[in-house]
Structures are given as C-alpha cells and as structure tokens.
Regions:
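Active-site-facing substrate-recognition patch
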Residues: 1-21, 164-171
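Hydrophobic Val/Ile/Leu positions in short beta-strands of Rossmann-like dinucleotide-binding domains
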Residues: 27, 86-87
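Short glycine-rich phosphate-binding loop at a beta-alpha junction
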Residues: 19-31
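Conserved acidic residues
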Residues: 22-23, 82, 112
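Short, highly selective alpha-helical patches that border small-molecule cofactor pockets
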Residues: 5, 9, 31, 35-39, ...
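PRPP-dependent phosphoribosyltransferase catalytic core
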Residues: 101-171
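Short, glycine/charge-rich flexible loops or terminal/linker lids adjacent to PRPP-binding catalytic cores
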Residues: 35-85, 92-95
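A phosphate-binding catalytic loop at a beta-strand-loop-alpha-helix junction
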Residues: 91-100, 104
Length: 171
C-alpha cells in the first residue's frame, strides 16, 4: 500500500544529513514504490542532486546467471559518476548489499550509503546502513544458515521464514 511506502520513505529521509547528495536510488528486492516516495521526500527536504534536471533517478538492476548485479546500457549513465543510495527491503547477512555495492563501484557510481526497512547490521565494510527497524526492535531476531539451523538440529519445526516477500508461515 502506498501509505506505508510513503511512511517508510519519510522515516528514512529523516536519518540523512541535509548536505547528503543523492542523484540515484537503486531499488533492490521490490522497493521501487518506496524508492519513488524516497526520491520525492529527498527533493521536498531540500537534499542536493547534481543531476541537471534536479530530480532523482529511481532504478532497479538485473541479476545475471551468476547472480551478479548488472545494469543495462540505458541505466549506466544514471550510475556512472552519480551519488548513489541503495534501497533494500532487508539486510540480514549483507550478501545482497555487498553485490550491490560491488556493482555500483564497477559501473563508476559514488556510493552514499544504504537504506532498508529492516537491517540486522548498522554498516557493512564501511558502508553505513540506515534502517527503519533494526535488531533493537526485534531483540530475539537471529539468522542461521540453512545448513546450521539450531532449531532444525534440535528437532524443532520452524514457525515461519522471513524474506523480501514477507513473512511465510511453515504450516
């Protein structure tokens, strides 16, 4: 729903300093609606953009067969030499965020940071992560590799899985 997307964008915008320059928001994990509201909120808040038209690009990448993040030729000018923010639904292990960072660096972008609805970490390899919700909000939150799940090893069934699509009960 758009109301919640707008509220998430408003919460995230309040976490950035007004001298932060954002030219492009790279939306991961289906966050395009939030990204559009975030671009609007940044513009309304007086945040800077070096784009000639003074608006912020909102784009999404593709994944190739090796799960690498790529951008098509028409999107590369929106990354190269641009101040880029990564927007994610959740950051748990940092693997997807790391792939996004590598891709933006490969295409010549200037990484400004990452934003997420939920993040289990505050930063990844020096990249700050601003999130609406974090481990302080879910103190019992844990992540386990599927090969090393303590509940599975104890013979207990998992109640649910959480991924970018949401909460999925394991009925």
């Amino acid at each position: 729903r758009t109301k919640e997307a707008e509220e998430v964008a408003q919460a995230l915008v309040g976490m950035y300093l007004y001298d932060t320059v954002i030219d492009t928001i790279v939306c991961m994990e289906g966050t395009e609606v939030i990204g559009a509201f975030l671009a609007e909120e940044l513009a309304k808040g007086g945040f800077l953009s070096t784009n000639a038209h003074k608006s912020i690009y909102v784009i999404s990448p593709e994944f190739n067969n090796n799960s690498q993040i790529i951008f098509r030729d028409n999107l590369i000018p929106m990354i190269r030499d641009k101040h880029v923010m990564i927007l994610m639904a959740s950051v748990t292990t940092g693997r997807t965020l790391n792939k996004a960072v590598e891709s933006i660096q490969y295409y010549g972008g200037i990484l400004q940071g990452a934003s997420a609805i939920f993040s289990a970490m505050d930063s990844l390899d020096g990249v700050p992560i601003k999130s609406v919700f974090g481990k302080k909000d879910l103190p019992d939150y844990t992540y386990s590799d599927y090969r090393d799940c303590p509940l599975c090893k104890a013979g207990k069934k998992i109640d649910a899985l959480v991924n970018t699509f949401g909460y999925s009960p394991m009925g």
